[in-house]
Regions:
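A bilobed periplasmic-binding-protein/Venus flytrap-type ligand-binding module shared by bacterial periplasmic
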Residues: 2-7, 64-90, 94, 238, ...
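Detector for C-terminal structural segments
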Residues: 3, 68, 92-122, 164-173, ...
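Ligand-site clamp/hinge motif
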Residues: 4-50
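Short, hydrophobic alpha-helical packing/hinge segments within bilobed ligand-binding/sensory domains
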Residues: 28-29, 37, 47-48, 78, ...
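A ligand-binding cleft/hinge motif common to bilobed small-molecule-binding domains
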Residues: 43-54, 212-216
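Structural transition elements
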Residues: 83, 109-142, 158-167
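Ligand/substrate-recognition segments at binding pockets and active sites
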Residues: 141-212, 284
Length: 311
């Protein structure tokens, strides 16, 4: 990338940026330490720990607005048993949210519901004591599955801020085995069919992520029944017209107090019900050369090149 001489904002003293694809965190750590690169993204906790002692490296830690979630299709044709509302409640109760945060790394949060921590109207985080295996087993029995069931989960080869979705899926599989649900994980490349199936609403059970297009809670309204993401889970507005109506209420609210109230109502409605379980609000870790200034985490585009200067 080369500097635009006609850029309307404040100019930096950097004329060219070279972007390199280095999927391996250890490779990034080594090339940053030796000065071959100046900024590294999507680092693991282990590589961050090693870089912490490097005198020529500075680390920026934070929490993004990107979320990882479990999706259970409401259409029984695709979701099978996970389309059952009581099964969905059981799965919520069975997940080990603190264990998921350990996999994702330092800075990970578990949002209370569908609105990320840090957004207007957010109700904060889901308490760790929400997990209850005995309650989950009872809910599963009430749903007609006292002995559990087998279910397929299709997961893509993507990652969320360096966290492999397959790793999150494996954790979900392990957690659900505690209540008798046997998950068979199949990995499919995004370009090889997963992407189309996800968008078309034909995936039955999956773990996916969602990044915000703009920093406002309205971006999360697409998870409501009838919304863009809601329909990917086979969740139509007709299935829950009261909750679906809150979409427009939130979009049209001009008073902050009224808007906050609608957003809180949405979160409460989706706290224990619905086809989506937000399992993690992703952390972000950026390591950069100490010769740079202005390197920081930005929700919408990870890093803002227009803020970076060489000291």
């Amino acid at each position: 990338l080369e500097k635009n001489p006609n850029y309307w904002g404040t100019s930096t003293n950097v004329d060219k940026y070279i972007l390199k694809i280095q999927p391996d965190a250890n490779t990034q750590m080594m090339t940053l330490s030796t000065g071959d690169i100046d900024v590294a993204l999507n680092l693991t906790d282990d590589t961050l720990e090693e870089l912490g002692s490097a005198e020529n490296v500075e680390i920026v830690n934070g929490t993004t607005k990107m979320i990882g979630f479990v999706m259970m299709n409401m259409n029984e044709e695709y979701g099978g048993p996970v389309s059952n509302p009581d099964v969905q409640k059981a799965i919520r109760k069975a997940l080990d949210y603190s264990g998921i945060r350990m996999i994702c790394g330092e800075g990970t949060l578990t949002p209370y519901s569908i609105i990320q921590d840090g957004f207007m109207g957010s109700k904060g985080i889901r308490p760790d004591d929400y997990t209850n295996i005995e309650e989950a087993k009872q809910l599963l029995a009430e749903a007609g599955y006292p002995n559990g069931f087998d279910v397929d989960m299709t997961v893509s080869d993507l990652d969320m801020e360096g966290i492999l979705l397959t790793d999150l899926a494996q954790k979900v599989k392990d957690d659900l085995s505690q209540i008798g649900i046997n998950v068979n994980i199949t990995t499919e490349a995004w370009a090889a069919g997963y992407g189309d199936a996800y968008r078309n609403g034909t995936l039955g059970f999956t773990v996916m992520y969602w990044g915000v297009d703009y920093s406002d809670p309205n971006v999360q309204l697409e998870f409501l029944p009838g919304g863009t993401v809601g329909k990917r889970a086979g969740w139509t507005a007709e299935m829950d017209p009261e909750l679906a109506a809150m979409y427009q209420e939130a979009m049209e609210a001009t008073d902050n107090d009224a808007r906050t109230q609608v957003l809180e109502n949405i979160q409460d409605a989706m706290y224990e019900d619905g086809p989506f379980i937000v399992i993690a609000q992703a952390p972000a870790h950026i390591a950069h050369s100490t010769r740079l200034d202005g390197v920081d985490i930005f929700d919408s585009y990870t890093i803002d090149f227009t803020e970076i200067n060489v000291k």
